[in-house]
């Protein structure tokens, strides 16, 4: 069951990472660009708060899909909408101070930015392992299809010698290829599980609740 959760965790990484990256860059660029007006700073603060919410969501994914105990950012754990964060008033300044001084607020920014790179890596790993494994496992069913070529094309060595090509075109070769596919599937699943565990633990380490602010 955990393997399926890890695969789902990896599959979600790229689309989520892309959305996070675009949202953070847009919010930061808009806020910095409008700093000369009164609206720029609130946009930056809202972006920073949104990043902590995203990090809290990532902590939940790490717990429920990655199987790692990850804490939400400090500010999010202490957040109380009645404390005056949404509208200036009692506790508003203190809430802003807690937001910008909590270490996990800024590690949340690191996490959100790193998610895009991890998502890209996860996408490549899933695509390559899935396509290669699928091709080998399907060999006994497609080896004699004239529209399908299963094998490795020839490679030129030192400009004079050609190695290959190696093509699966007989049933015994197809059976061997399917066995290779089973072995590759086992190896790929272990590597993908390790990749998912690494990211879940990385998330948990970044979001460790700090006892004091910056």
Residue ranges and their predicted role:
Residues 1-214:
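Acidic, polar-rich N-terminal leader regions of halophilic archaeal proteins
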């Amino acid at each position: 069951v955990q393997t399926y959760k890890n695969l789902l965790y990896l599959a979600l990484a790229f689309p989520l990472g892309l959305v996070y990256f675009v949202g953070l860059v847009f919010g930061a660029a808009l806020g910095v660009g409008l700093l000369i007006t009164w609206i720029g700073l609130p946009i930056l603060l809202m972006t920073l708060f949104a990043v902590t919410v995203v990090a809290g969501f990532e902590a939940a994914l790490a717990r429920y899909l990655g199987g790692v105990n990850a804490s939400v950012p400090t500010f999010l754990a202490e957040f109380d909408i009645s404390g005056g964060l949404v509208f200036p008033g009692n506790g508003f300044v203190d809430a802003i101070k807690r937001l910008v001084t909590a270490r996990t607020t800024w590690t949340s920014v690191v996490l959100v930015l790193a998610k895009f790179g991890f998502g890209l890596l996860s996408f490549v790993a899933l695509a390559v392992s899935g396509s290669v494994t699928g091709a080998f496992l399907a060999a006994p069913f497609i080896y004699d299809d004239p529209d399908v070529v299963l094998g490795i094309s020839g490679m030129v060595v030192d400009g004079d010698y050609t190695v290959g090509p190696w093509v699966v075109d007989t049933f015994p070769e197809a059976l061997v290829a399917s066995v290779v596919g089973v072995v590759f599937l086992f190896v790929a699943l272990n590597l993908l599980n390790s990749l998912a565990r690494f990211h879940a633990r990385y998330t948990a380490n970044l979001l460790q609740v700090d006892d004091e602010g910056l």
